[in-house]
Amino acid sequence: MTESVRKFEQELATFTGAPYVVTTDCCTHAIELCFRLLQIKTCRFPAHTYISVPMTMKLLGVDYEFSMTPWRDEYQFLGTPVWDSARCLKPNMYRERQYQCLSFGHSKPLDNVRGGAILLDNEEHYKQLKMMS
């Protein structure tokens, strides 16, 4: 890991209140890594989301259902501790024992770079996700 990535992860952790941050190339891959790590096989999420979300579920063989629940900044994959926080970046936004997947890019809260990140508080999972990313 480069020094600039390490510094960005530390600053993002401080800003969001997350004990650990793992950067990725996009939010979709952050979600995929969390589902793989946690071996999630079923979930429910809003029908009005990014097309890459159901595509990722299909790729992973996850049984999913759509809900008509409206969302604004972020939503939880119901039945899991994983959140799609693609449109959210706020001070102290981290939720304990959760995996919040962020997105950086055009029309997102941090739009001068392209990428993603996972906010979490489990040190062992942090180490595993770092190796997977």
What name fits each language-model region?
Residues 33-92:
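PLP-dependent aminotransferase-like
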Residues 20, 42, 77, 98-99, ...:
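Short acidic donor-binding loop at the edge of a beta-strand
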